[in-house]
């Protein structure tokens, strides 16, 4: 039976004597065995939220409860129920062995001496480091150190695990191993709070998703809830070479209220993603129509020597260099929904 391991109720967190509002009116919960992912642009408040849930920071107002214990009123009891994985190369005694590091942190976590050996061996096996117990920490790969961070955080049998960007900087194989470890950890009935910039990772792992921007919740729910909130009916992509006639921001505004258009540099070209707000039976044709309208209008205004563009006869018929030739339609992804909800309309990263 699932039970609530984390409750965040109307939490605010201010910095610089109240001049900076890092988190504003945040409320959510996590059940045992559930993975909740928090996503947002840099500075959205993700890491601040994780630190408050770990008791490293206290809320300016509101309350956070871990296993029913308030993180301010009963900080020590609340802290005992949570494991924090910040990751990175720091946090261990690099020239000591893996097992020596684990024994040290077992003492910190309050694991009794009689239980330390068995719990350490069990955790190292769980994270795939059972054969590395005698190795010095500095000899471990980055992915192995990240898994060691998870083993350390699980000392003392916490019911809640906090993972802040657990796969950042890892190669693809190490990232896959970490994701598999996260799934197996949740299967042990441990609630997990995850932050990540990888939308693919969030799609694969999260039971529920919470999108925040400027410290405020935009939307939370299962993947279909996020898609519904984004109000995207279809997605199209195309690219163009740099143009002396138009800036990329000009092109983004051509679609008005029909779509939100995002652009980024892709080598020597501009890559555009069109998030259609209104249903389109023929999105490719509509893109050509929009381009024809604005390009012809600009050329008329500049009194171009050309007599105009060839009439539109169908998709792919335009030969003008300002017309996209690689338009593709594809299914919506979480990244599309996230950008539609929380990202600046001119940036795609």
Language model segments and positions:
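Conserved catalytic motifs of ABC-family nucleotide-binding domains
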Residues: 157
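Short, charged/small-residue-rich alpha-helical element at the C-terminal edge
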Residues: 234-349
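Conserved ABC ATPase signature
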Residues: 136-140
């Amino acid at each position: 039976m699932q039970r609530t391991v984390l409750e965040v109720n109307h939490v605010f967190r201010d910095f610089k004597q109240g001049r900076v509002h890092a988190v504003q009116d945040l409320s959510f919960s996590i059940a045992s065995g559930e993975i909740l992912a928090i996503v947002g642009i840099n500075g959205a408040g993700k890491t601040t939220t994780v630190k408050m849930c770990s008791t490293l920071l206290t809320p300016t107002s509101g309350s956070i409860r871990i296993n029913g214990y308030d993180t301010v009123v009963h900080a020590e009891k609340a802290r005992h129920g949570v494991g924090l994985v910040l990751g990175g190369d720091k946090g261990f005694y690099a020239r000591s062995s893996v097992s020596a590091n684990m024994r040290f942190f077992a003492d910190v976590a309050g694991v009794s001496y009689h239980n330390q050996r068995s719990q350490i061996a069990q955790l190292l096996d769980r994270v795939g480091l059972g054969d590395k117990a005698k190795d010095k920490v500095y000899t471990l790969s980055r992915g192995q150190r990240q898994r060691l961070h998870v083993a350390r955080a699980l000392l003392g049998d916490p019911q809640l695990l906090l993972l802040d960007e657990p796969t950042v900087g890892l190669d693809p194989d190490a990232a896959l191993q970490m994701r598999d470890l996260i799934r197996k950890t949740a299967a042990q009935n441990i609630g997990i709070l995850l932050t990540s910039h990888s939308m693919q990772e969030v799609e694969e792992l999260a039971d529920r998703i919470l999108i925040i921007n400027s410290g405020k919740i935009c939307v939370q729910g299962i993947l279909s809830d996020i898609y519904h909130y984004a109000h995207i009916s279809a997605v199209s992509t195309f690219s163009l070479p740099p143009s002396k006639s138009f800036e990329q921001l000009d092109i983004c505004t051509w679609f008005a209220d029909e779509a939100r258009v995002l652009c980024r540099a892709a080598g020597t070209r501009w890559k555009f993603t069109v998030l259609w707000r209104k249903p389109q039976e023929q999105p490719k044709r509509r893109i050509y129509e929009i381009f024809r309208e604005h390009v012809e209008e600009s050329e008329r205004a500049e009194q171009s020597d050309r007599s105009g563009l060839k009439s539109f006869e169908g998709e792919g018929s335009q030969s003008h260099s300002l017309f996209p030739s690689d338009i593709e339609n594809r299914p919506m992804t979480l990244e599309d929904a996230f950008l539609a909800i929380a990202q600046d309309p001119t940036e795609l990263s």
